[in-house]
Amino acid sequence: MTDIAQLLGKDADNLLQHRCMTIPSGQLYLPGHDYVDRVMIDNNRPPAVLRNMQTLYNTGRLAGTGYLSILPVDQGVEHSAGASFAANPLYFDPKNIVELAIEAGCNCVASTYGVLASVSRRYAHRIPFLVKLNHNETLSYPNTYDQTLYASVEQAFNMGAVAVGATIYFGSEESRRQIEEISAAFERAHELGMVTVLWAYLRNSAFKKDGVDYHVSADLTGQANHLAATIGADIVKQKMAENNGGYKAINYGYTDDRVYSKLTSENPIDLVRYQLANCYMGRAGLINSGGAAGGETDLSDAVRTAVINKRAGGMGLILGRKAFKKSMADGVKLINAVQDVYLDSKITIA
């Protein structure tokens, strides 16, 4: 097992010993081996959705824990294939993307329709597929930031996918159209028995003010999570909160002083717990993103993110660039270290 305390360094005590005095853990619907029977059984999802959610939970190194380790590789569209795969050209071949997820013991592999369709007959029965339905792309000039549907729910279903995913840029001029598109897509996905995952991201240049990036503020990302759950996301993917007070700094929308005085603190675990509270207190699972590849600190950064997510009550990590921009062996090692956080019974809910 990974020496988690050593990787956390000077933050170890602050993260491993923290007690949450904001939102009590007893009010949350926490991950566990019985999550489908205990939590999802209340909702209106068809039985096939519950079956496919259980398939996710029963796969990989985290099988039976209620936690998820997902490998996402959709960056070939989002960030260009060259920028994404030049470090490891083997990942131009979709086969190797799926092999990385299998070798690392992930619950699921998430990618574009094209990537997964090209190898679906060989792999769809070996590891659960999550098809990302929409993407931003950076080939258009000048660059714009919008999400375009690249595939249909039916295409994902026909290749054997157990889940679909999509991004909404909440706060952008295009967000209301995206909400309508993805709400309809998620409705259809549930009809076909598939799990729905929303990348609930913020996007607006006004969210950066006085040198602070409020795209990762707990209050604004929390509301994005609430909207994600509103349109039927079974799992919400969110960037880890790094600050708070976005509503106040930008001076728009609605908030309450108690969000900052009682429901959050400066501890990152409490900030992520507020993100989770906005996922209907955990009735929709919260997975945090692993972030960009940063070099030598990738392992410690990924473990830190996993510890915060787990102790806040989150459901796992969706980590891609930190893994696939390394050799396959090093990528597997990094993903396994993250999984070790969720397998370690000593790392408890704060």
Regions of interest found by a model, annotated:
Residues M1-H79, S84, A117-R126, Y274:
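N-terminal amphipathic alpha-helix/helix-capping segment at the start of soluble metabolic enzymes
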Residues S25-L30, A63, G76-V109, G114-I287, ...:
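Alpha/beta enzyme core
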Residues N43, S265, G295-E296, M328:
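Hydrophobic alpha-helical scaffolding
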Residues S289-G291:
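PDZ domains - specifically the beta-sandwich core and the conserved carboxylate-binding loop
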Residues T297-V303, S327-N336:
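Histidine/acidic-residue-rich catalytic or RNA/ligand-binding cores of hydrolases
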Residues R321-S327:
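A short, acidic, flexible beta-alpha connecting loop/helix-capping segment that sits on the rim
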